[in-house]
Regions:
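Nucleotide-activated donor-dependent transferases that construct or modify glycoconjugates
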Residues: 2-12
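Conserved adenine-nucleotide phosphate-binding loops and their immediately adjacent elements
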Residues: 149
Length: 149
């Protein structure tokens, strides 16, 4: 799968690498996925639907509105979206509603996004919130599988 991970552009004078997206990228590449990380503070974010299967957007509370704008823009190109980060972990269902993303990672994104990118059914992806019948639903993976790794 081809995955674009972004940290939104927001008003800040501090420019530091986004380590969380680096961890995600490394894990996804380990499983054979093509990944690009874009930092909105340093570069222009371009959404090309021919290049990406899904766009992951990180959010801290200070720039959650910018996260929502990036989700909206990615979706306008027909791209699937997943949100994650500290803001989303605090209230994944409401974050999914507010952003209108396709998915929200409610815990450690490395496992969640790797399972989703590998084609696992959303209901079986650990730590995922997704839409079902127009409402946010938390995944309910087979608990036995949690102990098999």
């Amino acid at each position: 799968m081809n995955i674009l991970l972004i940290s939104p552009k927001y008003d800040s004078y501090i420019v530091a690498p986004h380590l969380g997206l680096g961890y995600l990228s490394s894990t996804l590449k380990k499983y054979g996925h093509k990944v690009k990380v874009l930092d909105g503070l340093r570069e222009e974010i371009v959404y090309n639907p021919e290049d990406w299967d899904i766009v992951g957007v990180s959010a801290m509370s200070t720039y959650f509105p910018e996260c929502c704008k990036d989700v909206e823009k990615a979706k306008s190109y027909g791209l699937k979206t997943i949100i994650g980060g500290p803001h989303i972990i605090c209230d994944p269902e409401q974050s999914l509603i507010d952003s209108q993303a396709d998915y929200a990672a409610s815990g450690e994104g490395e496992r969640t996004l790797t399972q989703l990118a590998s084609g696992k059914e959303p209901s079986q992806v650990e730590g995922l919130v997704y839409w079902k019948d127009g409402k946010p639903k938390r995944s309910n993976p087979d608990l036995k599988s949690l102990f098999e790794q």
